[in-house]
Curated annotation (Swiss-Prot):
Belongs to the chorismate synthase family. This is Chorismate synthase. The gene is aroC. It catalyses: 5-O-(1-carboxyvinyl)-3-phosphoshikimate = chorismate + phosphate. This reaction introduces a second double bond into the aromatic ring system.
């Protein structure tokens, strides 16, 4: 199975299934000398892990990460960092009744058709369980970017179902509040609406989609490799690799179709840019402004409302999903999106440093 790695200089390779023994990652390209401990990674893993509130899946995993290589006496050695998380709360019997049935909206059918064989327990490799290793690896990237460059990467949920957050401007976001509520939402009033919505979804046996934004502040000018490795192209690729993501926007995104040139261009003055419609990326290269990425996640298809599907013999069946599932997968997606943005940014920083370390910029950054 190909497609388990991302990055060129900072690379992350993951393996593991939802109901297997555990999850693993090999993180390569981390510069030596970075102070790093398991506690540094655990912070974001605890933000993502299941069973932390009644608004997400009730599968309870400690998601305790073990660093098994690449760190000595509290610092990275420059060699590959091995990470391990053991699964402890599998309930594979929840899936025994559907081993011969394809769940609609999931990867059961496509995995079976592609490989001729599949792990039906919780979706196997296609389960969002695998994103725990992305978060662990991304925490390494976030720490390097923060410690060495002062880059901050933070996300917040802007929409769940048909309810919206009314706080969008980064300067108005209380990040402590975002990380103190189960929805990673910046709008205190929206949190109560989200709570009611999730409660209703559970009663109705259905689910809903979500939208969230990730913001990277302090990114230096110059990251990105035109033309095929544009920074925004690689960010979009990374975000689309997250389970359930069906849309990615950078800056104003799809809204640019209704804009006009005189108002949508990010004009410049000696004191800085007057706007950030482009989301911090111009010509595939970071401009030094905040990089703003928005993603949309579809409703999970694992719901307690019966639906139609087929079995492995191609026969029509009525499908009812059992097990422990998120009524809205977007609730726990914020640290995953942060991790993927961090992975891309560190990879591009190392690539930029390798080729352009001696470049003398013609003027100081205006941001």
């Amino acid at each position: 199975m190909a497609g388990n790695s991302i990055g060129q200089l900072f690379t992350v390779t993951t393996c593991g299934e939802s109901h297997g023994a555990g999850l693993m990652a090999i993180v390569d390209g981390v510069p030596p000398g970075l102070a790093l401990s398991e506690a540094d990674l655990q912070i974001d893993l605890d933000r993502r892990k299941p069973g932390t509130s009644k608004y997400s899946t009730q599968r309870r995993e400690s998601d305790e990460v073990e660093i098994i290589s690449g760190v000595f006496e509290g610092k990275t050695t420059g060699t590959s960092i091995g990470l391990l998380i053991r699964n402890t709360n599998q309930k594979s019997k929840d899936y025994s009744e559907i081993k011969d049935t394809f769940r609609p909206g999931h990867a059961d059918y496509t995995y079976s058709m592609k490989y001729g064989f599949r792990d039906y327990r919780g979706g196997g490799r296609s389960s969002a369980r695998e994103t725990a290793m992305r978060v662990a690896a991304g925490a390494i990237a976030k720490k390097y970017l923060q410690d060495r460059l002062g880059v901050q990467i933070r996300g917040h949920v802007t929409q769940i179902g048909n309810e919206y957050s009314n706080v969008a401007e980064p300067s108005k976001i209380d990040w402590d509040f975002v990380n103190s509520n189960p929805f990673f939402c910046a709008d205190k009033e929206a949190v109560s609406r989200f709570e009611s919505l999730i409660d209703n979804l559970r009663r109705e046996g259905t689910s809903c989609g979500a939208r969230l934004e990730v913001i990277a502040s302090g990114v230096p000018v110059g990251l990105g490799e035109p033309v095929f490795d544009r920074l925004d192209a690689d960010i979009a690729h990374a975000m689309m690799s997250i389970n359930a993501v069906k849309g990615v926007e950078i800056g104003d995104g799809m809204a640019v179709a209704g804009q006009f040139g005189h108002s949508s261009r990010d004009e410049m003055t000696p004191d800085g840019f007057t706007a950030n419609h482009a989301g911090g990326i111009l010509g595939g290269i970071s401009s030094g402004q905040d990089i703003r990425v928005s993603i949309a996640l579809k409703p999970t298809s694992s719901i307690t409302t019966a639906g139609k599907s087929i079995n492995t013999q191609g026969e029509s069946v009525d499908m009812l999903t059992k097990g422990r599932h998120d009524p809205c997968v977007g609730v726990r997606a914020t640290p995953i999106a942060e991790a993927m943005l961090a992975i891309v940014l560190l990879d591009h920083y190392l690539r930029h440093r390798g080729q352009n370390a001696d470049v003398e910029q013609p003027l100081a950054s205006i941001t």
